[in-house]
Regions:
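N-terminal strand-loop element at the rim of the active site
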Residues: 3, 9-15, 19-83, 247
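A short helix/loop element that forms part of the nucleotide-sugar donor recognition site in Leloir-type
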Residues: 3, 187-202, 257, 386
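A conserved mid-protein helix/loop that constitutes part of the nucleotide-sugar donor-binding site
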Residues: 27-35, 207, 211-230, 240, ...
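Short His-centered aromatic/hydrophobic patch
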Residues: 102-108, 130
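Carbohydrate-associated surface elements
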Residues: 161, 180
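Aromatic "clamp/platform" in nucleotide-sugar-dependent glycosyltransferases that forms part
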Residues: 270, 289
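Short hydrophobic beta-strand element within catalytic cores of glycosyltransferases
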Residues: 306-309, 319
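Conserved acidic donor-binding segment of nucleotide-sugar-dependent glycosyltransferases
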Residues: 321-322, 326-333, 342-348, 362
Length: 388
């Protein structure tokens, strides 16, 4: 509920903002909440968090430590469990929030119902951030999201590609805010390169191709494994390292065994220190079929890693083909292998791309993106009652 306004149209206290998300695992959208909590203007925003899935808690403690209060689990059995909707309604009603900022189209469907069930004068403004291209979502999710989206909502997209993929009624009012990274802070991890390579058992003359991505179908791991088989056959001294966990872990390990990759491909599981692991890489690879604006890719650029990535979503907004890395078509393991072999055998080209990568990362400023989101909060909070 927007309180009494001061002369400039803003409340006389920090805005009470509730971030609503499916879970607090280690995915990109979840990492953005941590980033916003870290760099927020505490005089403007007092954030709270509500998340659906009790099994997804990796980042809950970090958000609490950064001042998000409360961090509430809605204890849903799944995203489609309707019982979380009245629970969210109670959280919003009791917290008297000014803004509800939703970070998933599926979650947005129920969150809108929770907000609209409140008395009109008690309804917070709604902001929805679209983190992935529209086609990556299930048809039923797309239908229900479009059906429930309100004209008074504010929509943010993490990349131009995401915005362009949205249905017309949403696309025409969506704003692009590309998030960023703290490149200087990330680069401090490079001092641990030798130590981390030692832990992974990597020889000095071995080239490491690494990735950081959840083990889900959209991340293209089966393609990467097929490509890895060809790269190892053609180059010999190349190792693959993958950090991440997810529902496909057993299937991917079985595929790795069938391909005979042995110790040439290592699944590390979830690593809280994933950026430190990345410091051991020589090439960063992302084989995704869908992406919005991958945070791991931005972290790789900050570390000065040349990139081989699929040209999907907002990837091309970060990588110019032939400059910071090489772009290939999705679901084409032969193209992926060719690009990886080319870079693995050409250290001078990798070094040149590393310089471009660092320069590109310097333009991706995390505090700037947080300020842009908070400017949106200020704008919608200063507007007197609109249609909700």
């Amino acid at each position: 509920m927007i309180p009494a306004h001061s002369a400039n149209g803003l409340p006389d206290r920090p805005l009470k903002v509730l971030w609503v998300i499916k879970g607090l695992g280690a995915g990109g959208a979840e990492q953005l909440l941590v980033q916003h909590a870290r760099y927020r203007d505490a005089s403007l925003v007092a954030p709270s968090v509500a998340y659906l899935l009790p099994q997804k808690t990796t980042l809950a403690a970090s958000l609490e430590h950064l001042g998000c209060s409360p961090v509430v689990c809605l204890s849903a059995r799944s995203s489609w469990d309707p019982l979380w909707i009245p629970r969210l309604r109670r959280v919003i009603r009791d917290g008297q929030f000014d803004i509800v900022h939703i970070h998933s189209p599926l979650v947005a469907i129920g969150a809108r119902l929770a907000v609209r069930s409140l008395p009109r004068r008690s309804r917070p403004r709604i902001v929805v951030t679209e983190h992935n291209v529209w086609s990556s979502h299930a048809p039923l999710t797309r239908f229900a999201d479009g059906l429930t989206a309100g004209r008074a909502e504010t929509h943010l997209a993490v990349s131009g590609a995401v915005r362009d993929s949205l249905p017309g009624s949403i696309r025409e009012r969506a704003r692009v805010i590309r998030y960023g990274v703290d490149a200087a802070e990330l680069r401090t991890e490079t001092q641990h390169r030798a130590e981390e390579r030692g832990r992974l058992g990597i020889a000095d003359d071995e080239v490491v191709v690494g990735t950081v991505a959840n083990l889900r179908a959209t991340k293209g791991y089966p393609d990467l494994l097929v490509a890895a088989k060809e790269v190892v056959r053609r180059t010999g001294a190349v190792r693959f390292v993958a950090a991440g966990r997810g529902p496909l872990e057993d299937d991917l390990r079985a595929q790795k065994d069938r391909l005979g990759l042995g110790d040439r491909f290592t699944f590390l599981g979830y690593r809280a220190d994933a950026v430190r692991v990345m410091a051991a890489f020589d090439i960063f690879c992302l084989a995704s079929h869908y992406e919005g604006l991958p945070i791991a890719l931005m972290e790789a650029l900050a570390l000065g890693l040349p990139v081989v990535a699929t040209d999907v979503g907002g990837v091309a907004e970060l990588i110019t083909d032939g400059q910071e890395g090489v772009l290939v078509a999705p679901a084409q393991p032969a193209q992926l292998a060719e690009a990886l072999v080319s870079l693995a055998l050409d250290p001078a080209r990798r070094a040149a791309m590393a310089e471009h990568a660092r320069a590109r990362a310097d333009t991706l400023d995390a505090p700037r993106s947080v300020r842009e989101v908070e400017a949106v909060y200020r704008e919608i909070a200063s507007v007197e009652d609109a249609a909700r």
